[in-house]
Amino acid sequence: MALLAEHLLKPLPADRQIETGPFLEAVAHLPPFFDCLGSPVFTPIKADISGNITKIKAVYDTDPAKFKTLQNILEVEKGMYGAEWPKVGATLALLWLKRGLRFIQVFLQSICDGERDENHPNLIRVNANKAYEMALKKYHGWLVQKIFKAALYAAPYKSDFLKALSKGQNVTEEECLEKIRLFLVNYTATIDAIYEMYTKMNAELDYTV
């Protein structure tokens, strides 16, 4: 659980504005999460998250004051790109990043909620499939969907996944789950706020890849 517990996201402020710098710093440590899933088929999601973080950071670094919050980025780019927006720049990168982050959130929440295949309780296929269905599937064409369906069958046992997530630390399953629940508090609130922002600014897109 050390992988997540060491980099908790900040509590969401009352105005629900997410500061870009601290957000990028926290989520930059999340791509190794997919290594814990074992299958190399999850590598594209990992690479997508890393690539989108890099794209957003490149924009942020040009003027940290102007792009202090994620909403600032969308607002500035909307004025900058005109008709091309939102399918451009850091706005597009954050669009896809939030989906990858939602996958992690739904997956971990499902495990914490005890959702499982009663015939194979130590498999995490049910949890990974739910996360894929809710976060990514509708944005993927049939070929990509087929690849990820195969990946779900290569997902590790829950016990092995939690051990990998804990970086080999000697902790009980319940201790690990409790730390995941703690991580999810601010993480879920932040992801929800990003989704709300995209809806309010009419920046959501539903094309497939």
From Swiss-Prot:
GO molecular function: ceramide 1-phosphate binding; ceramide 1-phosphate transfer activity; glycolipid binding; identical protein binding; lipid binding; lipid transfer activity
Keyword annotations: Acetylation, Cytoplasm, Lipid transport, Repeat, Transport
Pfam families on file: GLTP
List of residues that carry N-acetylalanine: A2
GO cellular component terms listed in the entry, alphabetical order: cytosol
Superkingdom of the source species: Eukaryota
Region 2 X 12 AA approximate tandem repeats: start-end pairs: 45-66
Example GO BP: ceramide transport
The keyword Acyltransferase belongs to this UniProt entry's keyword annotation: no
Transport among keywords: yes
Ranges for the Sequence repeats: 45-55, 56-66
Binding-site list for beta-D-galactosyl-(1->4)-beta-D-glucosyl-(1<->1)-N-[(9Z)-octadecenoyl]-sphing-4-enine: D48, I49, S50, G51, N52, I53, T54, K55, H140, Y207
Subcellular location: Cytoplasm
Family listed: Belongs to the GLTP family.
Binding partners and assembly: Monomer.
Its biological purpose: Accelerates the intermembrane transfer of various glycolipids. Catalyzes the transfer of various glycosphingolipids between membranes but does not catalyze the transfer of phospholipids. May be involved in the intracellular translocation of glucosylceramides.
Protein name, UniProt field: Glycolipid transfer protein
The species this protein was found in: Rattus norvegicus (Rat)
